[in-house]
Structure formats: C-alpha cells, structure tokens
C-alpha cells in the first residue's frame, strides 16, 4: 500500500509541477505570484527527483550465483524496446 501511495504522490507532484509551469508560461501571474509559484515548483521538483532516486535505488536485478542471490544495479539499457 505504501508503494501505491508513493507512486500517487509522485504522479500528483508531477501533475502539480506541470500545471505550475503552464501558469508561469502563460505570463498572466504577477511578479509575486510568479515567485511563489517558482518556489513551489522547486519544492515539487526536489520531491519528484527524490522519489525517482529512491525508485532507482530499489530497482535491482537479482541474479543467482553459486546458489546465492546477489544484487546488481538496474541497467535500463538491458530493457527490450
């Protein structure tokens, strides 16, 4: 359940960030509102980056070697296209 919540939090943060970018690109915000939106965007970006880093660290390929499992970092180059 915690994984689903984390995924939803990431998805919501990303959606919020995209909405902020659109508002900033429209140029209809005052300077103060733009700065507030920018600050919120920086926080959301950090949250998203943190979630991605955690996910990357969790994604590992398990290989059986000599009867023991060893962990290797995930390499996205191995994925079929």
Curated annotation (Swiss-Prot):
Main location class: cytoplasm
A single GO molecular function term of this UniProt record: exodeoxyribonuclease VII activity
Catalytic activity as recorded in UniProt: Exonucleolytic cleavage in either 5'- to 3'- or 3'- to 5'-direction to yield nucleoside 5'-phosphates
Subcellular locations according to the entry: Cytoplasm
Keywords from the UniProt entry: Cytoplasm, Exonuclease, Hydrolase, Nuclease
Any Pfam family: Exonuc_VII_S
Keyword Lyase: no
EC number assigned by the record: 3.1.11.6
Gene Ontology biological process terms from the UniProt entry: DNA catabolic process
GO cellular component: cytosol; exodeoxyribonuclease VII complex
Top EC class for this record: hydrolase
Entry similarity comment: Belongs to the XseB family.
Function: Bidirectionally degrades single-stranded DNA into large acid-insoluble oligonucleotides, which are then degraded further into small acid-soluble oligonucleotides.
Subunit-structure text: Heterooligomer composed of large and small subunits.
Protein name: Exodeoxyribonuclease 7 small subunit
């Amino acid at each position: 359940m915690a994984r689903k919540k984390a995924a939803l939090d990431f998805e919501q943060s990303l959606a919020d960030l995209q909405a902020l970018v659109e508002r900033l690109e429209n140029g209809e915000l005052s300077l103060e509102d733009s700065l507030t939106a920018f600050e919120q965007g920086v926080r959301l970006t950090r949250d998203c980056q943190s979630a991605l880093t955690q996910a990357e660290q969790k994604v590992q390929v398990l290989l059986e070697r000599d009867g023991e499992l060893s962990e290797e970092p995930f390499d996205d180059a191995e994925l079929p296209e």
